[in-house]
Amino acid sequence: MKLSFTKMHGAGNDFVVLDGYTRALPPLTGAQVRALADRHFGIGADQLLLVEKPTVDGADFKYRIFNCDGGEVEHCGNGARCFVKFVRDHGLTGKASVRVEVKHGVITLTMQDNGEVVVDMGAPVFEPARVPFDASGLDGRREGADTLWPLPVNGVTRWISVVSMGNPHAVQIVDDAEAFAVRVDGPAIERDPRFPQRVNAGFMQIVSRHEVNLRVYERGAGETLACGTGACAAVAAGIRRGRLDSPVTVHTHGGTLTISWNGACDERAPLMMAGPATTVFEGVIELPA
């Protein structure tokens, strides 16, 4: 079967986007997702994004996202930005703002006149059981309004914030994000048994109260050039710890995101993420068996 696709990226976090809205797509197996995402024998991507018809009232579209290991995940902020550019560029909507069904609810995406996309990422969740994170038997340490949890990582105790942005994140503050051994500690944190759904590991260097450098080791994808939900989780943790003030410029290897959150006044407030979305190329590929 021939499969039309669009290759896109948001700040270097790249996606294969498939249109299941105007045409019927067969259910994709994990092996097929891995083959399409393979950078040597397939198209190459961190994740695969499906555009579908919504199944809930009040949504214009539905999106599903799969990591390059074939597993379906809850949410991706960079993918959400690419999503709204895709549906507008392909004439599926003329709206500047669209409401999109994701696994954990409905989010609002807005295309700005400058070409950047603003995503209402929803409110962060800090309760360990809802992240989910098993904090049983651990003695947490308070910093500001946050609780830091000790996690043994390769023989060293790391103090982490746990945050859900619809998907789980473990955030730690480091002195130098560029020099930190992300690809050593990242896999150990990702698969720590206290995270029953595995976890995205964020390593944040604070430059000022409005600026950070961030690297994220994503579950099922490894280190990516940018992670939208990871940027939101890191900023939320930093504000809650009293280290950051909104808005925050987040520098990643792939580009810059701007995160705003009024969480110092109301933790139920949504995080707003602004950043680029870029189409790289379009093509047709034979769907692997």
Swiss-Prot record:
NCBIfam families: DapF
Subunit structure as annotated in this protein's UniProt entry: Homodimer.
GO BP term, pick one: lysine biosynthetic process via diaminopimelate
Active site: C76, C227
Key words of the record: Amino-acid biosynthesis, Cytoplasm, Isomerase, Lysine biosynthesis
Positions marked as site (Could be important to modulate the pK values of the two catalytic cysteine residues): H169, E218
Name of protein: Diaminopimelate epimerase
InterPro entries with a match to the protein in the record: DAP_epimerase_AS (IPR018510), DAP_epimerase_DapF (IPR001653)
Documented EC number(s): 5.1.1.7
Compartments, record wording: Cytoplasm
Annotated metabolic or biological route of this protein: Amino-acid biosynthesis; L-lysine biosynthesis via DAP pathway; DL-2,6-diaminopimelate from LL-2,6-diaminopimelate: step 1/1
Lineage of origin: Bacteria, Pseudomonadati, Pseudomonadota, Betaproteobacteria, Burkholderiales
